[in-house]
Amino acid sequence: HNPTESLVPNKDPLYVPFGHFNDIYSIVKSGLYYPAFVTGLSGNGKTFMIEQACAKAKREFFRVNITVETDEDDLLGHYALIDGNTVWQDGPVVKAMERGAVLLLDEIDLASSKIMCLQPVLEGNGVFLKKVNRFVSPSKGFTVLATANTKGKGSEDGRFIGTNILNEAFLERFPITVEPVSYTHLTLPTMS
């Protein structure tokens, strides 16, 4: 990303806020460090809700799609061969920290234990990039949101194959958990 390029997502004029949108928007708009773990069934709009909350709040947004293969190099940075030279490239976590942006760890329950490198980041501290001997502190406004189809406990019913049980210490780094709104309490009027 170009350091001067805005990473604020575009507002979708067709988006209709629902569920916990106002809660997510409040977290994003506050500019405070408040990691939130957002759970819900696949396809119910978790990621889009967070993106649109960032658009409304005019907050920069970095999305990282997590897989079982995601590791420290993918998240924090790595060396890459560019024009015949080996060059360090910051990962999306470092870029979001330095810009004071909102970082979305999408589908975090697909991750392996390789994401434990994020522990200091989730504690609100900086992170040491040992490969380049550099410490990165989070800029004002940086925060982390994570989405998951499960609550980090895996999928016993087989609906979400590939999801993993997340380390309890890792889950505890998210002071806010946003769960799907239950509509079972709604009563619909009957037509007579």
Protein language model annotation of sequence segments:
Residues 2-186:
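AAA+ P-loop NTPase catalytic core and its hallmark functional loops
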Residues 187-192:
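A short, hydrophobic C-terminal helix/tail in secreted or cell-surface proteins
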